[in-house]
């Protein structure tokens, strides 16, 4: 079986999106399937028609260059037109059995149109809804005209795809609520390869000293600094935490739109000696930073996106044998068993966040139990091998039907 994956972007770019994609491709190859890969014009590397990256071959789509391709709405239409045209070229060359379009809907609509023309079934995989992602990043207004138009396009794609997959139960419920048959929607949950993660590594003394963390209790967040991650709440909780445990440090690894705002907030709260910004770290160096920490914190605020979508980071924390705290948004509830594999606090509540951090830091004798439970959960219930195996039935139904 040959599957043509239609992607927003791919490696060598690094994101949760590309990590999930690569895990899916690796496991599909392990099942004996052939995979072919096309990225949209939004892939930001300089355009080349085809590219090899770490042994993976990618077809690339040229950017739209017409005058109207820089105008709102018309820009998106131009992107979809370019993707559809490139898809038809790749279909003719590769002759896939299935087209598998991954979020956003800008990939799904061209895939559905090209699939209909070529007589090939199309799977649409929803990782998040484009309208919610735009609202959370500040590029769109929730329930505004653009939001409603995008929601209409998403629903159209869900109805016209031959099958729908998604990453979690929250998104599945929303999809079914749009009138899509439950039998049409399959959850392919986010997962990890636990064997690829090491836990309890020895901290690098030189790195500890460089960051000023020697002899300190270290809380950490590793990832992109978006507003919905709630890192401002973590900074606001630090004064209360420091009053009780003055040797606590907060290490923020990464960067993003909120970077400067967070640095300004830390300075305003007189936390420059207690909140450490490492900047972005190469992927192969991230483990060194994880080895420094006692506690991972995921303080996401409650919005539609965080209630519906499950992140990868808490699963990675469990795989690395790290103690974790997370807000009680819906996406976290699907991944974390409160008091068993992690500890949850009331989303948006700075006092409860601080109280929870202090309770966990003062109760280290309970850590081995939680660490073992988390590691067992990801090994038994959230492996990529088990997750990707769910595609067997999805693809099988489509190829039998055709």
Q: What is each PLM-predicted segment?
A:
Residues 94-98, 162, 274, 290-307, ...:
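Acidic donor-binding loop of glycosyltransferase active sites
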Residues 4-6, 213-238:
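Conserved donor-binding/catalytic core segment of Leloir-type glycosyltransferases
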Residues 170, 191:
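Carbohydrate-associated surface elements
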Residues 338-339, 343-350, 359-365:
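Conserved acidic donor-binding segment of nucleotide-sugar-dependent glycosyltransferases
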Residues 260-287:
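Nucleotide-activated donor-binding/catalytic signature segment of Leloir-type glycosyltransferases, i.e.
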Residues 352, 359, 366-381, 393:
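A short, well-ordered alpha-helix in the C-terminal region of glycosyltransferases
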Residues 298, 316-319, 323-326, 336, ...:
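Short hydrophobic beta-strand element within catalytic cores of glycosyltransferases
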Residues 1-62, 241, 402:
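N-terminal subdomain of nucleotide-sugar transferases
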């Amino acid at each position: 079986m040959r599957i043509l994956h239609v992607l927003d972007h791919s490696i060598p770019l690094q994101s949760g999106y590309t990590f999930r994609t690569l895990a899916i491709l690796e496991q599909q190859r392990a099942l004996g399937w052939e995979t072919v890969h096309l990225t949209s014009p939004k892939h930001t590397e300089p355009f080349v028609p085809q590219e090899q990256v770490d042994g993976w071959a990618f077809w690339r789509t040229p950017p739209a260059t017409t005058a109207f391709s820089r105008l709102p709405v018309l820009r998106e239409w131009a992107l979809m037109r370019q993707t559809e045209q490139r898809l038809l070229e790749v279909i003719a060359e590769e002759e896939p059995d299935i087209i598998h379009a991954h979020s956003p809907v800008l990939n799904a609509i061209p895939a559905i149109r090209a699939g209909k023309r070529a007589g090939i079934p199309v799977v649409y995989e929803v990782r998040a809804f484009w309208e919610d992602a735009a609202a959370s990043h500040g590029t769109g207004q929730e329930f505004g005209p653009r939001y409603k138009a995008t929601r209409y396009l998403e629903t159209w794609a869900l109805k016209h795809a031959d099958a729908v997959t998604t990453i979690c139960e929250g998104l599945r419920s929303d999809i079914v609520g749009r009138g899509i048959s439950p039998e049409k929607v399959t959850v392919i949950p986010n997962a990890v390869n636990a064997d690829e993660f090491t836990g309890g590594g020895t901290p690098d003394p030189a790195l500890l000293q460089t960051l000023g963390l020697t002899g300190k209790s270290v809380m950490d967040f590793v990832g992109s600094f978006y507003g919905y991650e709630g890192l401002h709440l973590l900074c606001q909780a630090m004064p209360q935490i420091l009053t009780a445990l003055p040797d606590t440090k907060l290490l923020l690894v990464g960067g993003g739109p909120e970077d400067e705002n967070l640095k300004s907030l830390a300075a305003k709260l007189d936390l420059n000696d207690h909140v450490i910004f490492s900047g972005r770290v190469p992927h192969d160096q991230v483990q060194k930073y994880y080895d420094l920490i006692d506690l991972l914190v995921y303080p996401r605020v409650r919005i539609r996106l965080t209630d519906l979508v499950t992140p990868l980071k808490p699963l990675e924390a469990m795989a690395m044998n790290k103690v974790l705290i997370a807000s009680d948004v819906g996406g976290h509830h699907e991944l974390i068993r409160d008091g068993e594999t992690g500890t949850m606090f009331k989303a948006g509540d700075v006092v409860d966040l601080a109280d929870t951090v202090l309770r966990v830091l003062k109760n280290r004798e309970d850590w081995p139990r939680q660490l073992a439970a988390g590691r067992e959960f990801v090994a038994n219930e959230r492996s990529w091998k088990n997750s990707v195996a769910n595609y067997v039935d999805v693809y099988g139904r489509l190829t039998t039907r055709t």
